[in-house]
A protein has these predicted regions:
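A general alpha-helix detector
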Residues: 42, 102, 216-220, 236
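Short alpha-helical patches at coil-to-helix transitions and adjacent helical residues
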Residues: 2, 153, 207-214, 242, ...
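Short alpha-helical scaffolding segments that buttress acidic/His motifs in well-ordered protein cores
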Residues: 100-107, 156, 179-189, 217
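Amphipathic, non-membrane alpha-helical segments in soluble helical-bundle scaffolds
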Residues: 172-180, 203-211, 238, 242
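Core structural elements
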Residues: 8, 183-192, 203-225
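Electropositive nucleic-acid-contacting surfaces
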Residues: 226-246
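Active-site cavity-forming subdomains of large catalytic enzyme subunits
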Residues: 1-172, 195-201
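Structural helix-adjacent loops and short alpha-helical linkers that scaffold large soluble proteins
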Residues: 167-176, 225-230
Length: 246
């Protein structure tokens, strides 16, 4: 399975959005490849303000791929000014709202490209010292750094919450013990796993990424005698994840 991410300022973004359509030139379609938008906050600001958005060729704006946040906004505005002065040759201006509606339309029509946000993923990354995150993965549940020397891979596991509700209450001590064991086991996986490439091995050994999720939430809430859509269920879910996280 493959997933390609493209930033919203890329000159090919409009063609990229159409890659999964069932109509049009088949030579310009990729029906078996997943696609995702990698959207900077500045684009959403332009959508809200109903302003234009400028598309660039990456060879003329090489820094944009490797920066985010305020630095991205300053550099992007500078490139727009250069385009107006004629210093950049390959660019196109489009209404941001029109492009956003096209993104949503294709998502409704084909399920692609997915909507992911570059700035929140980087701002909240605990590995911002390791560089800029350029994409997520096939399921958009991990955000890790990649480079020519490192292919990001993650070791994942899940806890069955239903097994931690005993006699109508959440056994927090049992859940905490399960989390501790699961994290230890996932870390062991890093050392004994098979890696198809040296780049994947380099990434795993250097950063030791693990992801611990949950399953059985509905069953757990049922055993706690809570309606899934109730305020009490929301509070219980918060408490569950607080125990798991801390």
């Amino acid at each position: 399975a493959t997933c390609a991410y493209l930033e919203t300022w890329h000159l090919d973004i409009e063609d990229f959005i159409d890659l999964r359509r069932n109509t049009g030139d088949e030579r310009r379609r990729t029906h078996d490849m997943n696609t995702a938008n990698w959207i900077p906050d500045l684009f959403m600001k332009r959508v809200i303000e109903n302003r234009d958005w400028t598309l660039f060729s990456p060879d003329e704006v090489p820094e944009l791929h490797h920066i985010y946040g305020k630095e991205f906004e300053r550099k992007y505005a500078g490139y727009e000014e250069n385009a107006r002065k004629g210093l950049i040759k390959k660019y196109k201006s489009v209404p941001a709202l029109k492009l956003w509606r096209k993104m949503l339309g294709r998502l409704f029509e084909t399920g692609h490209p997915w909507i992911t946000f570059k700035d929140p993923c980087n701002i909240r990354s605990p590995q911002d010292h390791a560089g800029v995150i350029h994409s997520s993965n096939l399921c958009t549940e991990i955000t890790l750094n990649t480079s020519a020397e490192e292919t990001a891979v993650c070791n994942l596991g899940s806890i069955n919450l239903e097994r931690h509700v005993i006699d109508g209450r959440l056994d927090e001590e049992l859940l905490a013990a399960t989390v501790k064991t699961a994290i230890r086991m996932l870390d062991n996986v890093i050392d004994i796993n098979y890696y198809p490439t040296i780049e994947a091995q380099n990434s795993n050994f250097k950063h030791r990424p693990v992801g611990l999720g949950i399953m059985g939430l509905q069953d757990a809430l049922f055993k706690l005698n809570l309606n899934f859509d109730s305020e009490e269920a929301v509070n219980a879910s918060d408490r569950l994840m607080e125990v798991i996280s801390y």
